[in-house]
Every structure is written in C-alpha cells, then in structure tokens.
C-alpha cells in the first residue's frame, strides 16, 4: 500500500502523506469542503464558489449553509471562466474557503486556477479547494497554491490530495489507520487501480491532447455549417468536451434520436435534476431555451476520424428530421 501511495504521489507531484483515499469524488468534495470549514469556524463562515460546480459540491455547500455558513457565487464570464475581479470583490477577512472546479464537466471550460491561487495569497486564512475530476489527462494539473484537490479515476474510487500542513475535520470517524482525516481501510486492489489509471491517463498526454484537439476542430468546422447550431463550449475548452445547442430542439430529443443510431451523447451532467436546464450553459448564455437545447459530445484519444465522419452523417439525418 505504501508503494502504491508513493507512485500516485509521484504522478501527481504531491507528497505521499498528502494522499487520502476516498470512495469517490463526491466524498472527496464533501470531506474537503466540510472539513475545511468546520476546522476554520473560529476564523469565519464565508465561502465562495460558482454555479458550475458538481452536485456534490453544491450539496455540501447547502448543508454548510444550514449550519450557518454564508455562500457567495462568483460571476461567470461569457467564455465560461470565473470573473476574477468579482472574486476579488467577494473576498473578505472571514472568507475561509473558495471552491472551484478545474474543468467544467458540461462545457470543458478550464478555470484559471493559478491566477485564483495567486489572488488568495493575500488571504492567508482562506483555503482553495479544486475539483479536478474532469481535468486528469485533459489538461495540466495545478497544485501550487491549492490546499485540497479531488480526483476520481473514473469513477470507481477516489482521492483527495490535501496539503500536508492543512488540518481539516474528518467526516468518517474510526481508527484512522492510514490517515487521521479519513477512517476506513483502503482496498489495495482499488488503490493499485488508481495508480494504473493515472499512469495510463498521463502517458503521452501532449500527443493525445493534440489528437483530440484535431478531431474537435473537425467537428466544429463541420457542425458550424448548420445554421441552427450554436456552440456553448469556448474555443479554449479542453478538446475532449464539445457542448452545443440546436436552436428550437430540446437536447433530450437529439439525445434520443442519436441514441437510436448507437451514438451516445450527454444532456447536462450525470448528477443533475431531470427536466431542468443545464446550469453551466445557462450560467454562460443566460438563455434558458438554449440551455434546454444543449447537449455534450465527448471525445477521447481513442476516437478516430472515421468515427467522426460516421457521427456527422448520423447528425445530418437527425438535424433534417428534428430541426427542419
């Protein structure tokens, strides 16, 4: 177990004692947010986050609000990144936590984590939590200035990377055999799987990202020929995620029609409430109808040009049937 933890830490550029095993990203997010805030209750109860976060972050923040915490959401710019000036305006002496996702799961937006960390240097009592679940293998992980980072590879098990000098309140109590912050004996097989999954995700990363980026550009160029198509993902998003809307057609309709042709696309994030618009798309576009029409294409380094060509043929048939 020690060798595996050393291997994971080396891959992430962290110290072995900074690695905490959890059941998944939801637990990692809850442990980080609740653990930080509860350990900082003597400093303050003010938290800053965004409307783009995973439901495990939103749920944890709601629970903390019920315990008397105050939560402010930083504005989102049109390109999907947070408004850094608004973040500066929201920060207070009693702000104890800023919680930001590294990569948005619906749009693929890459948040400026290093710039956020630099801003927080002037607030030594404020901790930065980063949900990096969507970032591993898609972009460079930034650990400098980050106090806690959630990872789920993907999604059979979880990790929380916690800065070694940071004290948080545990949420699961017991013997604390491997760490005082999370009781419960980790499963060796799952821990070994994390190391292997991380190694596979990070090997040849630059070449793989370049391959996916080329496919993304091809998709954008071809889909842009359809007058009712609107891209929601910014140009500088991770290329693995392409979110779009077809004006006047609900995303669920396209999802069902494409599904009949064995094409799988996503409508919102997996943990969203059914029947509601994508909160990420709405946060960027401020357009409820557009958000309801949105859906996401996912690409990987295993996707081929032939598969893109086949998808475009199927999309063309679906577009003619649903949008005209």
What are these regions (language model features)?
Residues 1-324:
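Pyridoxal 5′-phosphate
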